[in-house]
Amino acid sequence: MTKKKVKVGTNTIALNKRARHDYFIEDEMEAGLELQGWEVKSMRAGKANISDSYIIFKQGEAYLFGATIQPLNVASTHIVCDPTRTRKLLLKQKELASLFGKANRDGYTIVALSLYWKGAWAKLKIGLAKGKKQHDKREDIKEREWKVTKDRIMKNARLG
């Protein structure tokens, strides 16, 4: 019996760290992406950015808007490579209906959280989010600073 090969490295292509700072993430979901060949090659080279991207709905379908995938220099010359084109998300009808309803009725925003490989497929983790106010962001910063201070105090108490 042959052993499975252990993969070295990470499966993450791009992260949207700003999303967790600007929004309360209520729910997360995984979606596939409809990509062109040059986009897959660029993503394998790590040329993707989803920091300012979000999900829009058009004609009952969900699309990733604002994501940038820079084409490689060796990309095909007979295809026009648009780095900021809107890309269709591959979701089940039930998931689409749920997201659409919450975004329209309840005032949620749907943001892209991370882009990663799952096997040979590129997947996008999307989050159902509510916007944070300025005071919420300040509270998060205070909590983070208090945690660091508390850990420092506990470490000094253990050592001395």
UniProtKB/Swiss-Prot annotation:
Coiled coil: none annotated. It comes from the Bacteria. CDD domains: SmpB (cd09294). One of its GO terms (molecular function) is RNA binding. One of its GO terms (biological process) is trans-translation. One of its GO terms (cellular component) is cytosol. Keywords: Cytoplasm, RNA-binding. It holds the Pfam family SmpB. Gene3D superfamilies: 2.40.280.10. NCBIfam families: PRK05422.1, smpB. Required for rescue of stalled ribosomes mediated by trans-translation. Binds to transfer-messenger RNA (tmRNA), required for stable association of tmRNA with ribosomes. tmRNA and SmpB together mimic tRNA shape, replacing the anticodon stem-loop with SmpB. tmRNA is encoded by the ssrA gene; the 2 termini fold to resemble tRNA(Ala) and it encodes a 'tag peptide', a short internal open reading frame. During trans-translation Ala-aminoacylated tmRNA acts like a tRNA, entering the A-site of stalled ribosomes, displacing the stalled mRNA. Belongs to the SmpB family. This is SsrA-binding protein. The gene is smpB.
